[in-house]
Structures are given as structure tokens and as C-alpha cells.
Design a protein with these regions (language model features):
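Extracytoplasmic low-complexity segments
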Residues: 1-128, 296-302
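Active-site-flanking beta-strand signature of metal-NTP-handling nucleotidyl enzymes
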Residues: 70-72, 146-150, 161-163
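Structured loops at beta-to-helix junctions and adjacent beta-edge loops in soluble globular domains
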Residues: 72-76, 122-124, 150, 195, ...
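Extracellular glycan-interaction surfaces
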Residues: 101-125, 136-138, 146-156, 172-250
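Extracellular beta-strand elements of beta-rich domains used
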Residues: 147, 280-285
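Exposed, interaction-prone regions of secreted/extracellular proteins
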Residues: 156-163, 171-172, 262-265, 280-282
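A structural signal for beta-strand register positions
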Residues: 221-223, 267, 284
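Flexible glycan-contacting loops in extracellular carbohydrate-active proteins
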Residues: 244-279
Length: 302
């Protein structure tokens, strides 16, 4: 018997050959389906070649089946007639699409900067706009998970910055923050953080890893090692620093929780989103990951 799989050659066995084409991920087919969904919803893809390349990156590196969220304004967004951002689309499905939300009186519209390929987000004490996923998302399944992204702090004379991540019980539980503060007391292109395993019985201790140098849109990734209580920070393909190990020996286990992805500030216990002023360019979340994923993800945008 001659067994041939997807070669185009005749099969001479006693049973028909298995057609595995439906189970083989094809970046071009995934992109075509995604584009059809975006266009049908009234959106557009400013950078179609880049979007297709991102599907290729996820598929070819074995990340597609482990990704819960992947979005970049240049890879899909919808704006209204005045240019206000309504939606930033999730490459992994509509449930993760980022929908515009607001509180109070926003100081300025939330718009897309085509040059920076980023959405500008500001929230003050008076109000503002933010982006929040359509539904709750899985944060992690394995003992190690990953966040990666690129953002920019747009005003260096305040103490705000911009945060992307998952919030539970009024706390940022898995997040990326970019911040440079007045007087340069904080200069972080990226900070990845969570709480230790004393949460949820208590608030838990804050665990974080950050760079001490600021620049806009720096490619980075945070590898959250739940079982050993450490976050590893990667930048441009290299491990830059690990966090101080948690006092409990583990990070907070979020595997039984789902919550929206929020980009802007932190959603507090009263459901108010905290102040921010920055720009969001790209974000990727893997529910299960390892060091090789962090190396690759921290090079996105280079």
C-alpha cells in the first residue's frame, strides 16, 4: 500500500485518502476570512501585507492555536465619519475585538495616527475614551503565559502613561504598561506585572519587571512563569531582566478566570478606568508560552 498525504498523487490503497486540508492552518486563508469579517463590519485594514505576515508569524511559529488575543490598529480598525475609532479587530476572532468605551466627558476624540500606526487614548479626571474587548477572554491555561506589545506615552509631564492588560477585583492582574513621568522619576518603555499567589484570598504582592530606559514603541514581551513566581522581560529578541521572585514562590493563578482585555488605564473596583495618555500600536497574548515564544514575540515590529 502506498500512503500519500496531500501530494496530489494518486492513492492506490483500499480506502480513500484522508483529506486533512481543513485541519491545516493556511495564513492566506485565515487572512482572507479575517478581511471578509472586517470589511463586512464596515472596517478596513490599513496594512494588508503586514496583517497577512502576522498570520504567517502566528501559524509558522506554532502560536496560532495558543493565542487568545492579537490586535494592531494597522491590521484592522473601524472609524466613524469624523475619524473616531470604533473598533480595533482581533485576529483571533470577534470576541476579542476592542470596542470603544467612554466615561465622563472625554478631553479629545480617540483617533488613529496613520504615521505612528497607533490609536491615541486619553483619560483624565473629567473622562475619556478607552478600548475594551467585546467579551471576557482566557488569560492563561498553562503554567507559563505571555503578553507582548508596543505602546507610547504621549505626555512626559504627567504621571500617567498607558496600560494594556487584564483586570480583576480592581487590580491589574496581567498587564503591559508604558510610562515616562514628570521629572523622569519613572522611565519605562515597558513594564510587565501581576500579583503573587496570595491573591485572591488577599490583594497579593505586586510583581513586576521593567526596563529603566524610555523610548516609544519598543518591541518587548513578558513571560509570566506562574509556577516559579517570576516574570521575565524580553526586548528585541533578548532576555533583559527577570523580576524579583514572588514572596509566595508563585504568581497569581488566573487559569480559572476570564476578563476583558482593556487598553487605556486600569479598571478600578468602582469600574472607573484610571487616567492615561498614550498610544497603542500592537498587542499579543498567548495562554501558553515558553522562552522561544518570548524571544520571537519581543521582536515584533523590528
Amino acid at each position: 500500500m502506498v500512503a500519500v498525504n496531500q501530494t496530489g498523487k494518486a492513492y492506490y490503497g483500499f480506502r480513500p485518502a484522508l483529506d486533512l486540508s481543513a485541519s491545516i492552518l493556511d495564513p492566506q486563508a485565515l487572512f482572507a476570512a479575517y478581511k471578509a469579517r472586517v470589511v463586512a463590519d464596515g472596517g478596513s485594514i490599513p496594512d494588508e501585507p503586514g496583517c497577512l505576515a502576522r498570520f504567517g508569524f502566528l501559524v509558522n511559529n506554532g502560536m496560532y492555536s495558543r493565542a487568545t488575543f492579537c490586535a494592531a490598529p494597522a491590521f484592522g480598525l473601524k472609524v466613524d465619519g469624523a475619524g473616531n475609532v470604533q473598533t480595533v479587530y482581533n485576529l483571533l476572532g470577534a470576541e476579542g475585538d476592542l470596542i470603544a468605551g467612554s466615561q465622563g466627558t472625554p478631553p479629545l476624540p480617540m483617533t488613529y495616527d496613520a504615521t505612528a500606526r497607533a490609536v491615541i487614548i486619553q483619560i483624565t479626571s473629567s473622562g475619556g475614551w478607552y478600548l475594551k474587548s467585546r467579551t471576557n477572554l482566557v488569560i492563561h491555561k498553562g503554567s507559563t503565559y505571555l503578553l507582548a506589545g508596543r505602546m507610547s506615552d504621549l505626555y512626559r509631564a504627567d504621571n500617567n502613561g498607558i496600560t494594556a492588560g487584564y483586570n480583576l477585583t480592581g487590580l491589574p492582574m496581567a498587564y503591559l504598561r508604558t510610562m515616562i513621568t514628570n521629572g523622569n522619576t519613572t522611565t519605562e518603555s515597558w513594564r510587565y506585572g501581576t500579583r503573587d499567589s496570595a491573591w485572591p484570598a488577599g490583594t497579593g504582592g505586586a510583581i513586576g519587571v521593567a526596563t529603566s530606559i524610555y523610548a516609544d514603541y519598543v518591541p518587548s514581551a513578558g513571560l509570566f512563569k506562574v509556577a516559579v513566581g517570576v516574570i521575565e522581560g524580553y526586548e528585541k529578541g533578548k532576555l533583559l531582566a527577570p523580576s524579583v521572585p514572588s514572596a509566595t514562590g508563585k504568581l497569581a493563578d488566573l487559569s480559572s478566570y476570564t476578563t476583558p482585555m482593556l487598553i487605556g488605564g486600569t479598571q478600578l473596583a468602582n469600574n472607573i478606568v484610571s487616567a492615561c495618555y498614550g498610544a497603542f500600536q500592537d498587542m499579543l497574548c498567548l495562554h501558553t508560552a515558553d522562552e522561544s515564544d518570548a524571544i520571537l514575540a519581543s521582536r515584533l515590529g523590528m
